[in-house]
């Protein structure tokens, strides 16, 4: 499978986004530079006809903080940080004063501050996301559950070391991601594949979980009794969110993010922590 190729050859949109934001930051008042962001997110409907002001609202967070070692991911992590607004009072109190970005900054490798913006972004994506989440939840765990052994040629340490030695322009050339790989594959696979725009796999969220024919478990996972029993989220805040989504035609990216977090957290709670498993936990 292709795990690792996006990380080591700069295939993810977040890499292009970081470079465009850095370019934009050199002239933050420009109305043209932010328009480049529309090229990399054609799949997000509300950005297709967005004005420079709308783009600044979505992508302008800490735009000029280019010296920050976590610059590439600051916007994404700020968006996901909105989930904390829906935490219960007890959870808010338990995380009060903890800054995960400060914690991560203290664990960066030697010389990290001198790396290029792209190299920093690749390290963060590989270390935080791929190693800590992607390979287990979407790779090995899914494969092993179905008696399939995944093979990951792009994760061969020799391939990783080679790609790490490449100049940035051979990985991300302008907004052309996986540049060297595409050049090498030209003539070996059809041009329609080589030149095909990158298409993220996006699952529907609110349109499924809040539909009339939604899965049976959803009502239970979003119920006030489950929210109060698990104690992670605020029942009032979640109820307000659900009401807002149901009144809207479509949910925002952040609303979908919160909805997914609530349902996923409660499924984990039900599976591993609920009272019916208390005997196992105590054994």
Where are these regions (language model features)?
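Active-site adenylate/phosphate-handling loop in enzymes that bind or generate adenylated species
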Residues: 1-48, 116, 135-159
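Adenosyl-5′-phosphate
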Residues: 49-283
